[in-house]
């Protein structure tokens, strides 16, 4: 044991990031062995040829099929493509079994979505070296559930997540801080975990094209361009990440809100709506940072005479983006503001849940122009009508209608 202990750092942590490969497709294959080795896609209504590819097997990817591709196009590339409709009940059960297996190795597990999670194995040296533990986890998932995964091994969450993306399927990658200059820095900033297309564009605007340039960039210029989040990204580009694996994290987030007390009473609607938009942006950032979504938006209006009005809107579908939160909040505002001057304004997202894979699929569609003109729910209805995929809408609702939700089940078992 003492020899094995020497394979762990004297200071610092050992973090694993377990990421299931093509999760939905892999679950389908595990439950129907005849699909093994064949091009498979999980998508919408095959008969009407209106589906969108949610995920596909690696065999399908060899034909050029990708997530978000229209089903008709995928069929053109691969006429023999096998299509399955999404089965969220099946996927949730497989996810629960996955986390049960992970819990054999450590109690320090942080699920971040239906198909991925972090483990802190710093104190698990009695089980073997970090690489041996990763191999045992990978083999257990493959043998017992027939589900492949990739695992990243690193000293912090960011590097572990980055490492797990490097080898798929069935990869195990060790990423140390000393590996960063060679393995991470040459990549474009858009390839870095946590940087989306818009953030990458902003960084490009200040002549930051690579992760190395981000790591070595001027902190003040980066902060001025994208705020405090930019400084956090710069630290991670240097390999620094102080976040802990927190098994109780989800239980702490019953709501996410922000409010602002004004130095003087305000009655200009434009200024108040501008503040409402800024508060919505702040709530959105906090939700996305924690991979959460909301099914209820609430506003608080405190008037100059201390009267307080709190109103909320129940939503049919999960939201997390700034524009959707602001849309719900501004509607409430227009319905309930009586015209008097305001001293405090607040926006809160409640009924918080994980941004599970079924909810994430709504990210896959680009209906930005429609979203500017139509309510979010109308856009989602349009997606369902056009692509024949009502499960994208109802799947997220199904997660919430269980007597004991998937999230609660995980929390009660592992947290």
From Swiss-Prot:
Co-factor: note: Binds 2 magnesium ions per subunit.
Listed name of the protein: DNA polymerase IV
Protein role: Poorly processive, error-prone DNA polymerase involved in untargeted mutagenesis. Copies undamaged DNA at stalled replication forks, which arise in vivo from mismatched or misaligned primer ends. These misaligned primers can be extended by PolIV. Exhibits no 3'-5' exonuclease (proofreading) activity. May be involved in translesional synthesis, in conjunction with the beta clamp from PolIII.
Upper classification of the organism: Bacteria, Bacillati, Bacillota, Bacilli, Bacillales
Species name: Bacillus cereus (strain ZK / E33L)
NCBIfam families on file: PRK01810.1, PRK02406.1
One Gene Ontology cellular component: cytosol
InterPro entries xref list: DNA/RNA_pol_sf, DNA_pol_Y-fam_lit_finger_sf, DNA_pol_Y-fam_little_finger, DNA_polymerase-Y, DNApol_IV, PolY_HhH_motif, Rev_trsase/Diguanyl_cyclase, UmuC
Compositionally biased tracts (Polar residues): 246-260
Active site: 116
